[in-house]
A protein has these predicted regions:
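Divalent metal-dependent hydrolysis catalytic cores, especially in the metallo-beta-lactamase
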Residues: 117-138, 155-162, 191-204, 213, ...
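Histidine-rich, glycine-flanked metal-binding segment
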Residues: 21-33, 42, 48-89
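Metal-associated gating/positioning segment near the N- to mid-region
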Residues: 86-151, 170, 175, 181, ...
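Bacterial N-terminal signal peptides
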Residues: 7-17
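Surface-exposed amphipathic alpha-helices with a cationic face
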Residues: 144-148, 209-220, 288, 361-364
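C-terminal cap of metal-dependent C-N hydrolases
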Residues: 40, 428-474
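Active-site neighborhoods of metal-dependent hydrolases
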Residues: 186-200, 204, 249-393, 397-398, ...
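Divalent metal-coordination and catalytic microenvironments
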Residues: 40, 56, 61, 85, ...
């Protein structure tokens, strides 16, 4: 019987492999030994001004050269794309890019979108992500392996372990730490399993955070945090590497805050806060001196609290983006729209969001490293890829120039990951991870949404085909 089954198993494996190859091929727009992208505008991700009428040569998965089209020569057999009217940007480096999505319920539940999110991230130009917290860590690790092997389409993934949460979690998808020893155990277990970063959460104690940071740093790994029980300055002194959500998550300005407890009234304290005060300036100085990066995640706050507007913060074109709504399941779409309907039209939330934006600008002005992500949680209106574009647009709304915002969303993330020699900007020798958009984001940042081709390791994927392949799936799988 075993002898008869072996040929059948081999046949089925071969059919499966062929199907996966065929599935990948249908989404490829361009693949060749040598590719020439001619007449293209280049925003290289370094913050430099755009360069017009450039030719980018791609070979072996890498950028071979960049130069003026008028003076660049290349072999006649190169696959040439004339990109007049288009802009090449580095692939985005998403630094708060979960693979899970809110499913509603009480208590709140979350499920991995292992089918839809990898394709959407890739389709919309996010070629590298850090998952920044996992509710299904084995799934995330396996997805990374499948993507790296070419069996699944998606971005390059840096896997963050399950949340390091203290007692009092608001959702059952998180393990609650027992003590500092439990934190050490979790860090070492998940580092052994393949996680490359860790995320402390809202109710962690100082002892637990210190233990996690010590164990992670012994292994050359970093710790970020969405904190509440611990203020930013305390966390920086403990040795945390990164803080998520900027000003929104800093509880240290609550007057009667108790150690190791997440206080009520954080938003109220921030509404009263003077960013020019000595306390805020000391926080910024401490973060910069301790080399603590901040992750900007403006879209999740906009979607959750900003009233609809014609443009700017709360723009209906962003919060009710039809292309985004189309990739949601009916249940997910209805749930989000119901949540949006509860947002007060007279909300003073916009002023708080403006203050958070000003804090991020002040942090950068002081020399801090600001990185970017979307955080696809909140009220269910933040979706892979679409939210990443909105984050860049909101950075411009915050007062950064378009090329500065693009740098924050690309090269800055690569620097934090220690990957700046490989990704994050368009330069000879780097991986050919690029997004090709119609228009000029340096003049009109919303053009970043007009993605047509995404190159990952030198292979150009059709953005629209990838998006169409996951219509109605977000909120299901």
């Amino acid at each position: 019987m075993k002898t008869k089954l072996l040929p059948l198993c081999l046949f089925l494996c071969a059919v499966s492999a062929l199907a996966q190859t065929s599935d990948r091929q249908q989404f490829i727009r361009v693949e060749a030994p040598l590719i020439a992208l001619t007449n293209v505008r280049v925003i290289d991700g370094t913050g430099a001004a755009p360069r017009e009428d450039q030719t980018i040569l791609i070979s072996g998965g890498k950028i071979q050269s960049i130069g003026p089209t008028a003076s660049t020569t290349y072999p006649a057999d190169a696959r040439t794309l004339d990109l007049k009217g288009y802009t090449a940007l580095p692939g985005l480096v998403g630094m708060h890019n979960h693979m899970f999505f809110p499913m509603g319920g009480s208590p709140p539940m979350y499920s991995n979108m292992g089918s839809s999110f990898p394709r959407l991230y890739l389709a919309l130009g996010v070629t590298t992500i850090r998952t920044t917290g996992s509710v299904a860590p084995y799934t995330d690790l396996e997805l990374k392996r499948l993507i790296d092997s070419g069996r699944v389409l998606g971005p390059k993934m840096h896997i963050t372990a399950p949340y390091l949460e203290g007692k009092g979690s608001f959702t059952p998808v998180m393990h609650e730490l027992k003590d500092a020893d439990d934190a050490r155990r979790m860090v070492n277990y998940w580092a052994d399993a393949g996680a490359t970063s860790f995320k402390a959460y809202m109710n962690i104690t100082r002892a637990e955070l210190r233990a996690a940071v010590e164990e992670a740093h012994k292994r050359g790994l970093k710790v970020t945090g969405h904190l509440c029980s611990i203020g930013f300055r305390e966390a920086a002194e403990i040795g945390i590497d990164n803080l998520e959500h900027g000003l929104f998550a800093d509880s240290e300005f609550v007057a009667d805050k108790k150690p190791d407890q997440c206080p009520q009234g954080v938003s109220a304290s921030l509404r009263q806060l003077d960013l020019n005060s000595a306390a805020v300036q000391e926080t910024i100085r401490t973060l910069v001196q301790k080399n603590v990066a901040i992750t900007s995640t403006l879209p999740v706050f906009e979607a959750g609290g900003a009233p609809l507007a014609q443009n700017g913060i709360g723009a209906a074109s962003a919060l009710l983006n039809q292309r985004m709504l189309n990739v949601m399941s009916t249940d997910a779409r209805v749930r989000y729209l119901q949540n949006r309907a509860r947002v007060s039209s007279s909300s003073d939330f916009v002023a708080l969001l403006r203050k958070a934006m000003d804090f991020e600008r002040a942090f950068v002005k002081a020399g801090g490293l600001l990185i970017a992500g979307l955080d696809p949680t909140g009220n269910g209106g933040i979706v892979a890829g679409f939210g990443d574009h909105r984050e860049v647009e909101l950075l411009v709304e915050a007062g950064f120039t378009p090329v500065e915002a693009i740098q924050i969303a690309t090269l800055n993330g690569a620097k934090f990951l220690g990957e700046e020699a490989r990704i994050g900007s368009i330069a000879p020798g780097k991986q050919a991870d690029l997004m090709i958009v119609k228009g000029n984001p340096a003049a009109n940042i919303s053009d970043i949404e007009k993605v047509e081709i995404v190159f990952k390791d030198g292979v150009g994927y059709d953005s629209e085909k990838l998006i169409q392949s996951v219509q109605g799936l977000v909120g299901i799988r």
